[in-house]
């Protein structure tokens, strides 16, 4: 079993170290992670400059690029053999609902998914790493389950773990993505040099945290497991858009 491990918080992040330690013994682990924090990088690739690859003293490989860069470079240029699984995390904070569109953690797993490799993203829903060992224990259980009984391809799982002791977790729940309210307004401020700058505001609160969602499950103390897909086609609108676009198509 060959497992590629990445994240978006950087190769020095406690969440990555805890995940690698938890997965030890399950297979041959290769760690390729960003040199610096790339939270919110989504699926971006670096196309305007070359990437450098270095190895840390603990054997972790780090890249001066995004999470997607890391997995892409690993799969197409670093690893001698294709991995059986790609895992990402453990993220410092939740990746639920709309977060998944922006998440570098989910993006690293998505890159593996795009290459046809089963992929899992792990996030601890509160920042600060308070119960990171418990989160890593839960992550290992999910990976063990995938190894023991692999899901049929394609596989992209988004796993959010409550910030509590493992003994206080209430099991696992298969969920759908919830939804957040729009983000808070940007924060405008002025630098000491008189330049106006803007900070992106905090994420919005949960708008859909009803039973069955990732928000609801984690609030109940459950580990949320959400299967994702990357087909962005709105299939239910295809016929409506065909009718709407008919005059355009005729005149084309």
UniProtKB/Swiss-Prot annotation:
EC number: 3.1.3.5
Cofactor: binding comment: Binds 1 divalent metal cation per subunit.
Reactions it catalyzes: a ribonucleoside 5'-phosphate + H2O = a ribonucleoside + phosphate
Any Pfam family hit: SurE
Cellular compartments per GO CC: cytoplasm
Record gene name: surE
Residues that coordinate or bind a divalent metal cation: 8-9, 39, 91
Domain of life: Bacteria
Organism encoding this protein: Bordetella parapertussis (strain 12822 / ATCC BAA-587 / NCTC 13253)
Main subcellular location of this protein, as a coarse class: cytoplasm
Localization in the cell: Cytoplasm
Essential cofactor(s): a divalent metal cation
Alphabetized GO MF terms: 3'-nucleotidase activity; 5'-nucleotidase activity; exopolyphosphatase activity; metal ion binding; nucleotide binding
Protein name: 5'-nucleotidase SurE
């Amino acid at each position: 079993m060959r497992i590629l491990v990445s994240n978006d918080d950087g190769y020095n992040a406690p969440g990555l170290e805890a995940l690698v330690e938890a997965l030890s013994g399950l297979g041959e682990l290769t760690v390729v992670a960003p040199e610096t924090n790339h939270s919110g990088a989504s699926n971006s690739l670096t196309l305007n400059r070359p990437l450098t690859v270095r190895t840390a003293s603990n054997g972790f490989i780090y890249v001066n690029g995004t999470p997607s860069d890391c997995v892409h470079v690993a799969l197409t240029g670093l690893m001698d053999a294709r991995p059986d699984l790609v895992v990402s995390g453990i993220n410092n904070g939740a990746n639920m609902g709309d977060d998944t569109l922006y998440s570098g953690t989910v993006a690293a797993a998505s890159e593996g998914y795009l290459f046809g490799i089963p992929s899992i993203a792990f996030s601890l829903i509160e920042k600060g790493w308070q119960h990171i060992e418990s989160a890593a224990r839960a992550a290992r259980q999910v990976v063990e389950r995938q190894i023991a009984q692999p899901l049929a391809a394609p596989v992209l799982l988004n796993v959010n773990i409550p910030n509590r002791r493992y003994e206080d977790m209430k099991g696992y729940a298969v969920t759908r993505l919830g939804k957040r309210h729009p983000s808070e307004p940007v924060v405008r401020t002025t630098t000491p040099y008189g330049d106006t700058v803007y900070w992106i505001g905090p994420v919005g609160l949960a708008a859909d945290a009803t039973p069955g969602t990732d928000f609801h499950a984690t609030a109940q103390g459950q580990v949320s497991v959400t299967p994702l897909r990357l087909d962005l086609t709105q299939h239910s609108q295809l016929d409506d858009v065909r009718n709407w676009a008919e005059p355009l198509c005729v005149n084309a």
